[in-house]
Each structure stands twice: as structure tokens, then as C-alpha cells.
Amino acid sequence: MHRFYHPEQISSPCKIILTEEASNHLARVLRLKVQEPVSIFNGDEYDYHGIIQSIDKRKVTINIETKTLNICNPKIHISLLQSVTSKEKIDMIFQKSTELGISSLQLIDSERSNFRIPDHKIDSRLEHLRKVVISACEQSGRSRIPTINNRIISFSDIEKSSENVLKFILDPQAHQSLGKVEFNKIENIMNILLLIGPEGGFTNSEIIIANKLGFQSINLGKRVLRTETASLAMLSAMHMLFGDFV
């Protein structure tokens, strides 16, 4: 069943009018017809099921009949602090991490970031990324949309979080690998924070600051991974240990 995002509150039963963008996709790209079933989500915990009532040039009306609790939302809250990199890589990281079950996404400027987003383009860039994650939610079946901070923070803006948050910073030179972490001694982990550097990695001073904020330095083996590979590998590993892959 095809899924569509609707940015407004939904009750069940009710009638809704899809956005112009969603209406165009339904009618002109997918070429769905009146009376075909569809599923709608709006960012809450539910999927709303209905049928297409009418299709006009720029407006599609859906008759919502029932709702069900979404079973694809992530079980644990994983936040990704991702150093700014190229547009294509950031798009892929946000898309794939949404599919894998990320809950929160934050872009950070680090000393070795070789890409910068001009101030006058930040709002449009973040709006584009929000569309990327919504599309990934449509594809993957989840209904909760990952939060995206409305600004890009500097490394010094990273705040110390509560003690019950498991925090990792990836460092190829770290003495401890992910496989050596004594996870059997960690209980009731529901919040995880991942700090991923740019192509050139974090500087020593940044790693020291992160360690003081409670981040454990770890590596992912002998091979040096690209920033987009490292982000998705860590997210997958966390879900294997604590989340949706268990």
C-alpha cells in the first residue's frame, strides 16, 4: 500500500486533502485511481488508512477510515551529531539513517570540515533535508519523523548530556574498538548519542573536549571508513546491540 505524508493533525474517521506535492505524486507519478487504498502518516505514532475519494488537478481527497499503531518506529532514541560534509553525502546520511531508525539529526561544524553551508542557504538546506527524511519515512514504513535541529552548531556548542545517555565519538586512532566495549555491564540504555567527524577526522583538541563531555572514543576496526560509512555502520551496530535488530 502506498504511503503519503500529511503535515496536519488527523482524526479517524475523517476526510483530508493532501498537499499539492503529495497530490501530484499520487495522481501523476503513481497514477493511482479513485477507491484505491492508501496509508497516511503525520509524524505521530499512528498510520491512518483510507481510500482515495476524489482526484482533481492539484487536489486529492482521502477518506480516512481507521488508524493503527505504527510498528516500524525505532525502539531506542539514537541521536547523530554529523560533521558537515558534501551535499550528496549529507543527503545520503540523512536518508539512510532515517531508514535505519535514527531519532534525531544534528549537523555540526568541526575544524577539519572542508565544506561550509553559507548562512543565507542554511534554512533552505535544512528544509531540503527535512523532505529527504520524510521521503525516507514514507519508504521505510515508520511514522515518527526524525527531528532536525534548525541550525548548524559548532563543536563548542555540544552540551553535556545526562548520565544515562551512552555516548560515542569515532576516532580511527582510539585504543578501544566497538567490539571491546563491555556492553554486558550497561543496563537500561534507551538514549544513544553518536559523534561522527568529517573526512579528515576530528582534531586532538576536539576529541579531548568530547571525552570531557562523556563521549567514549572508539574505532570500528583497522580500516579507515568514509564519514557516511562510519555513521551508518555505527547506527546499525547500536540497533544490533540495543534496538530494532535485537
Regions found by a protein language model. Name each.
Residues I71-F168:
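RNA substrate-binding interface of SAM-dependent RNA methyltransferases
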Residues M1-N70, I122:
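N-terminal positively charged helical leader segments and presequences
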Residues Q9, K67, S110-R112, K222:
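Short, ordered loop/turn segments at secondary-structure junctions
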Residues N204-V246:
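Structured adenosyl-cofactor binding patch, chiefly the S-adenosyl-L-methionine
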Residues I16-L18, K75-S79, M190-L193, K212-L220:
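Glycine/charged-rich beta-loop-alpha catalytic/anionic-binding loops adjacent to active sites
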Residues V38, N63, L69-L81, F183, ...:
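Mobile, glycine- and charge-enriched loop segments
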Residues S162-I208, F215-I218:
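Active-site/ligand-binding-proximal alpha/beta "capping" segment
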